[in-house]
Amino acid sequence: SKEINILLGIVGSGPTKRVPAKIFIDFMRLVTQKHKCRFFLATGKNIEEQKILLEILSTTFKNNCYALDNLSLNEILPIIKNCNISICNDSSFSHLSSGLGIDTIVLMSDTPLLYGNYSPKMYPIIPDGENTVTHDTRGKDRINPDKIFEQLNNILS
């Protein structure tokens, strides 16, 4: 199968919106068993985001990862445009990638669902055990990597 370019939007506007590295890593493990992938990691310089980035870069997937944290927005936009799919916390990158026409799986852990499903290019994933999501859901540890993987396969098929 051809290589797929995946944007991982690790950035989040606050600690309750940043899905832990483990969830991204578990998803990466699932997807690389079925597809040849390149991962583009979108983070800010915030210390918590850098920790998540370093945790991902210390895995066996590091050679397939490209960190975007030293690039300007002008340099990042064409990279996003060349991704086949994007998996982002509810953050600037989920809005940018869906706005650029990229199918975007939005990890909704702590904000109203509307923020992550207003575009036909957005596919929200909500925490396990919830029927919807809002400002105090605090579900970042309950985002299920299997559901992300299932959604990716549905989009790509």
Predicted regions and their residues:
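Short, histidine-centered active-site or binding-site loop motifs used for metal coordination
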Residues: 10-12, 129
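Donor-binding and catalytic core of enzymes assembling or modifying cell-surface/extracellular glycoconjugates
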Residues: 23-110
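Conserved hydrophobic helix-helix packing surfaces used for dimerization/oligomerization
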Residues: 6-8, 39
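Short, well-ordered coil/turn residues at beta-beta hairpins
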Residues: 9-10, 89
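A short, glycine/small-residue-rich beta-strand->loop->alpha-helix junction that serves as a flexible
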Residues: 13-20
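Nucleotide-sugar donor-binding and catalytic loop/hinge architecture
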Residues: 1-6, 33-34
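Nucleotide-sugar donor-binding patch of glycosyltransferase catalytic domains
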Residues: 95-156
